[in-house]
Amino acid sequence: MCGSKPTDALRTLPERAFRLRARLIAVGLCAVCFAGLIGRLFWLQLCTGGWYTQRALGQQLRDTVVPADRGKIYSADGALLAANSSCWTLRASPREMPEEKLALAAKGLAEILELDEAKLLEKFNDRRSNDCLLRYRVERETADAVRDFCAANGITGVRINQDSKRWYPQGEFLASVLGFTNVDNAGVSGLELEYNDTLTGQNGVVLTAVNAWGYTLAQSYETELVPVEGSGLRLTIDANIQHYLENALNYAVQEHHVAARSVGIVLEVNTGAVLAMATTPAYDPNQPRVIADKAARAAVDALSGKERAAALQLAQQTQWRNKAVSDLYEPGSVFKLITCAAALDAGAITRHSTFYCGDSISVAGTRFHCANHKRHGSQTVTQALENSCNQSFIQIGARLGKQAFCDYFAAFGLREPTGIDLPAEPKKSLYYTADRMGPVELASCAFGQSSKISYLEMAAAVCAVVNGGKLMQPYLVSDILAPDGSILRHNQPVCKRQVIQPATSATMREMMEAVVLYGGGRNAQIAGYRVGGKSGTSQKLDSADEKARIASFVAVAPIDDPQFLCLVCLDEPHSWTTAGGSLSAPVCAEVLEQTLVYKGVPRATDTGSADAQAAALPADGDSFDGA
């Protein structure tokens, strides 16, 4: 027994070594596995943890956007022009709806919301869906009907979320200036588009917890970020003056059977502030896709298919277009104010210069005549303006010369956008440059044909003629407002440049008053106020109708202390005449008289002699090239 112990000891050595190696291998394997686990945890926690967290939150949270109200728009006198009204968006979560009541829900909701029952039931049967839109922005009555139906029938899973939409409380009023918004409350045209970033608020959000099956948990789990209303606008537009302009313009359009859209503008002469701006016929920005003009709507309804769709789109784009800013026109004899001011300022003529008007005048082989072939004989510059004499202004243009004419044309801002804070202003007008202008082109441009400018450009240029020679930038927004009504930014008037000398401007004011007292502008006279103006009746050179005319008039009052300018243009009137002095001048007089009284400008007490003298003088008729 004793002799076997060494042998047993030798036999246990390999076993011990084997066991040790086994332990070491086991420990090593454990270490490797542990290291792998640590590495995986490191990767999951630090490298991809954010991604998994977001996925988990996405499954556990449902976020509902709470749209912010757009900023409100007010007139200068405080009238609310654009605001927001409550509406409701209806959504459903099919997986939360009782399966046995899906058919009942589809039938009832389809009836209330005027939807297709079969299609609605198909949506509800998709139990994987957690969200489907039923109707977007419905009125309170519809939302209440859905709420009552669901409550009465024990239907869950239908969500009624309060929303807001743009609302224009005064309908068509100022529509072409305000513009409108789309279904997402983003500006599409007008001030809504130009100031979209300013008016747009910061949306809020409601985070709602959901369980593993997608069902909404108790309201105590909700988190809400409150929406922030956008900034508001206070305009230079005075609601009272805007009403004066729209009422007078609408009456004239109906009275004289105006075929195309007509324009009216009222500016503050010394600042460029737009007090009123209208394009007729207007449209309702609450229903911008409904064609407001009856004739245009009838023409669209008479078509079908693709033709109708194209005609509808064109009609909509036409009614949305602010013609006062976006369209170009031949200004006609109103432009003679620019030619006259330029020639006086350049020293090419004086107010006492005389010109002769016979049967016609020949320029490079082309004959020009005055309206109705009138012969005015010898006349001063003032008389030529009173008579709107084409032949005299052809001679004035020739004395000024094409280079100086083009220089003043540019200086009066007629080759560039006015810079008004509205979209869709043309980048440039249509005109001749000096290197492309021959004697005939200079002659026709001198009395207001052969060039096309915007209505607003013409109004701004005449302001410079009478306000001492300063070209002011027209503008519409006076103040940017915080939601509480406090002023965030005030816009100051901008003088672009000095165009003519103050003395020239003073002379032009006297001559414009003579036009209203003794010439073709007598229909613009206002009892107790001194008024200056000029008429125009321009031929539409790009129209297929050779008889198509634009009857226009521009008036300034009081002319001895210029404050307000009114430009009215009736596009294609079909009346007893097409003369601007007969059709448009009375509109200017009505608007300016109401404005002067409203603004508290006192009437003169003794104007009888001037009125009687003016009434005793014969009016010089005006036509397409002599108005």
Which sequence ranges carry the predicted segments?
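Periplasmic/cell-envelope proteins involved in peptidoglycan metabolism and beta-lactam response
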Residues: 1-303, 319, 328, 403-413, ...
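Beta-lactam-recognizing serine transpeptidase/beta-lactamase-like catalytic domain environment
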Residues: 2-13, 82, 211-224, 269-334, ...
